[in-house]
């Protein structure tokens, strides 16, 4: 009997701690609902779906597990904000400053990050399927195992990004920059990398099957054991790329 009571107390305490960790600040939420900015605020677990928060300052704000479905955050200041495990499907973040923001385990599928800055952001295991990243700054992002199938990321800058084991199948990456990026064992099947800059990138064991690499720059890229079967490579510039054991036959 005493043992069962002890277990019940522990369970209730655990639930209380969990809810406390994700309980947003009522004053912060009310301020946002009344049109104010909220830098450094606590909006964890809050439902802000469909709201227009464009242009506001949310620097270092906690959005952990918040609901931001179809929320507008265009040109918002979101540096160092935490969106861990948040729902951002169909959200609009055009031109937003998201430098060093935390999107680990977040779902931002179908969202619009056109012209946004995500420099140094944490996107590990983030869901970004069918998102728009046109002309976005993704320099030095950490995106291991991120799911980005079907993204529109033409002219985006992924310089020195860390993208091992990421999923970028059927993505539009025309004129994108991956200079020095780590794409080890990444999935890029059927993606369009026409005129992309992949110089000095790490593509070992990556899958580029049936991708488009016309006029792409691959000088000094590491393509050991990469699968390039069926890829279109008209006028591709390999320079001194490392192609040891790469699969090139159709």
Residue ranges of predicted features:
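Bacterial N-terminal signal peptides that target proteins for export
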Residues: 1-9
């Amino acid at each position: 009997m005493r043992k069962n009571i002890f277990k019940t107390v522990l369970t209730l305490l655990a639930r209380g701690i969990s809810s406390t960790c994700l309980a947003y600040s009522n004053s912060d939420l009310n301020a946002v609902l009344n049109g104010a900015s909220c830098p450094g605020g606590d909006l964890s677990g809050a439902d802000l779906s469909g709201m227009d928060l464009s242009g506001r300052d949310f620097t270092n704000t906690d959005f952990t597990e918040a609901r931001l479905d179809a929320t507008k955050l265009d040109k918002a200041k979101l540096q160092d904000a935490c969106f861990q495990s948040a729902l951002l499907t169909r959200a609009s973040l055009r031109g937003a400053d998201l430098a060093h923001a935390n999107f680990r385990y977040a779902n931002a599928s179908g969202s619009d990050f056109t012209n946004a800055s995500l420099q140094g952001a944490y996107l590990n295991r983030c869901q970004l399927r069918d998102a728009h990243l046109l002309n976005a700054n993704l320099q030095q992002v950490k995106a291991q195992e991120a799911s980005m199938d079907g993204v529109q990321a033409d002219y985006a800058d992924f310089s020195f990004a860390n993208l091992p084991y990421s999923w970028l199948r059927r993505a539009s990456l025309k004129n994108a920059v991956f200079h020095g990026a780590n794409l080890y064992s990444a999935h890029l099947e059927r993606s369009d990398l026409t005129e992309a800059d992949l110089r000095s990138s790490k593509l070992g064991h990556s899958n580029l099957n049936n991708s488009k690499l016309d006029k792409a720059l691959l000088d000094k890229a590491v393509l050991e054991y990469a699968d390039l079967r069926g890829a279109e490579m008209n006028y591709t510039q390999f320079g001194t790329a490392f192609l040891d054991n790469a699969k090139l036959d159709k």
